[in-house]
């Protein structure tokens, strides 16, 4: 009772808690952000950018300031620039964040949203207030260097990786309950194998779909009890592990916001990613992408063996031979185009640009 009285379970939802970003010379954060964006616009588009481009940047700047996400952009561009300075391959942009011209100007992304008619509102919309989320890809082999940089910059007690829970799927629920009930493993395994192998199928769906399973439940009360109990625990957490990409960065020590634990000597939150977002904490995805590593290695080999230096920012996106290859389904090893479904789609689409 004494411990219970001392516990505090008051949570603050809907209030964003961004870590503090230190600007050069203590400059006003928004003024510094504007400076970076306007310098970046000149760098990207020249001294006299099209009027529509300048207007788009002003609109984004106003929206970002009003929604309180100036520091968010500054935090992201800081570690992205660090990675680039260290020669760590960084993806050009993925997801809705590629629709921000401000992100393009300051160097978070390298995809021109105006050229490809990308919408800023998919990323940040005043009518749908939610934390924006840049998905940043890094070289798989050097991703940890970027996380280490963020940890040094904000402090080890201000950075943690994020827990993720594996849940009990249909067959696992049957096997776990059968073991607790003391049923013979062979009998339990026979029941589990009657669950169709459809992806993410639930026990209720399995019962509807599998006539042999329904028959066994009707004939054997023990199997009926097994299934009834398994349905109650299906979907519950079974084991904890560390999220492959998620990192939380906080203004005050992480422990002042959420409980922590260690997993393989890594400090992780005991709250999952969606809960952290609801609490207003900054969650970043540091995605390790093997494709970037392969591309960098290929560029190095071309330089070494052929004496040709390739700049991946200046390659031709309208190479007819490449487009013809994609149109015939020859996309093995091409990121996001290598699945059977995408190959068939490319054959039907036959891209021309």
Language model regions located:
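Alpha-helical scaffold/interaction cores of sigma-54-like transcription cofactors
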Residues: 1-353
